[in-house]
């Protein structure tokens, strides 16, 4: 298989974890910000997580530099465009990007400006390249909840025209879903699709709760259903897709090594698995890398790869017309 040429779908990719290091330097110059260094190798080292981190929280420290520069409309539009450009250039045909709008208000940007900027960057890339995309609004579980409704209302102006879904992300504690039930309900009332980060840090119960309490149609990671039979059966029975991110799952210690990743066992048992990058820069990866790692580690055939590709298409938060277009690459 030529992994670069294969059509690819990425349903789980974070904007602030996928910024080009050179762009950090460029934007810092434009914004008169002082970086710890102007050496791109030093900047890259600060943005890329080690191959294995002690835990997820250590991995999340790599988002500090992007957060510093992602505070203007111009920066957000550029970073959005470049991410879709990078994906298109390795034959990613459809990309869903998630980001936390509340993280980009340090300099007073309005929620409307934030949403407009990322969608504008994406649409510019869609016009220039053979790629389609959408945005997912991520709320960090640790942030105050009083702004969540405002985020959802601002995003609703672009609903199904660049923004499609609601997500909860960040450090994961057991039982977090209970306190977010009203917000997930409100998101659904507005017309958002639901995907929730859960089961990345040891709590299979969180996956069960994400589906049963929050109405998750997809789950970010979901690794720890392997030791929670009720969550496992719910995912399987409800055909909830898992957004697995192999390199990231190894880095954050969700699994000890790629060979121990449950993606193939899940797949063979009929669970809807997908292959995704999570954070292209922080995990120093591409979709080409992720596909190669999974295909080679688990000896997948080309037919099995295209089956997983089709699972990704069927679970994408996009229109039937776009899905038909994406399925044409698998024929």
UniProtKB/Swiss-Prot annotation:
Record-marked site positions (Important for catalytic activity): 221
Q: Which UniProt keywords apply?
A: Hydrolase, Metal-binding, Nucleotide metabolism, Zinc
Q: Where is the active site?
A: 200
Look up the coiled coil feature and give its residue ranges: none
One Gene Ontology cellular component term attached to this UniProt record is: cytosol
Q: Name one GO molecular function term.
A: adenosine deaminase activity
**Mind telling me which Pfam families this protein's record contains?**
A_deaminase
**Sorted alphabetically, which SUPFAM superfamilies does this protein's record hold?**
Metallo-dependent hydrolases
What reaction does this enzyme carry out catalytically? adenosine + H2O + H(+) = inosine + NH4(+); 2'-deoxyadenosine + H2O + H(+) = 2'-deoxyinosine + NH4(+)
Ligand binding (Zn(2+)):
12, 14, 197, 278
Q: What Enzyme Commission number(s) does the record list for this chain?
A: 3.5.4.4
Its needed co-factors are: Zn(2+)
Q: Which GO terms describe its biological process?
A: adenosine catabolic process; hypoxanthine salvage; inosine biosynthetic process; nucleotide metabolic process; purine ribonucleoside monophosphate biosynthetic process
Q: Which domain of life is it from?
A: Bacteria
Supply the InterPro entries for this chain.
A_deaminase (IPR028893), A_deaminase_dom (IPR001365), Ado/ade_deaminase (IPR006330), Metal_Hydrolase (IPR032466)
* Textual note on the cofactor: Binds 1 zinc ion per subunit.
The positions annotated for binding substrate are: 14, 16, 170
Q: Which PANTHER family match?
A: ADENOSINE DEAMINASE
Q: Could you tell me what this protein does?
A: Catalyzes the hydrolytic deamination of adenosine and 2-deoxyadenosine.
Name by which UniProt lists this protein: Adenosine deaminase
Organism, scientific name: Vibrio vulnificus (strain YJ016)
